[in-house]
C-alpha cells in the first residue's frame, strides 16, 4: 500500500496537552498533543456519535464526552466501558512545521 501523506494543520494549531478536531479530505479526525508528540484518531467515538475533540484529554487518554469511555490516543485501545471497540489511529509526521497524516 502506498503511503499518502496529507497536510492537516500547522503544528502551532495544536496546543500543548490539547485535542483539536479537523477534517482532512472529508474525514473527521482528532489530533492530540501528548508529551511533545502528535497523534491522530478518528474523531467519532466507536460507542456513540460523540466527537472525541469535545472530550477530555488526560495524558495519553481521551475521555468521550457522551458516556465517559476512554481510549489510549497513541494506540487507539479502548480502555474502559462502555467502549469496547478500539478507535482507528493514523500515522503522523511533522514536515516544515506542518502536521501530516497518512490516510492510506
UniProtKB/Swiss-Prot annotation:
PANTHER family (UniProt xref): 3-PHENYLPROPIONATE_CINNAMIC ACID DIOXYGENASE FERREDOXIN SUBUNIT (PTHR21496:SF23), FERREDOXIN-RELATED (PTHR21496)
Source organism per UniProt: Pseudomonas putida
Binding residues annotated for [2Fe-2S] cluster, in chain numbering: 45, 47, 64, 67
MF annotations from Gene Ontology: 2 iron, 2 sulfur cluster binding; metal ion binding
GO biological process terms on file: catabolic process
Lineage summary: Bacteria, Pseudomonadati, Pseudomonadota, Gammaproteobacteria, Pseudomonadales
Metal-binding found in the keyword field: yes
Name of the molecule in the record: Naphthalene 1,2-dioxygenase system, ferredoxin component
Domain Rieske: 6-101
Alphabetized InterPro entries for the sequence: Rieske_2Fe-2S, Rieske_2Fe-2S_sf
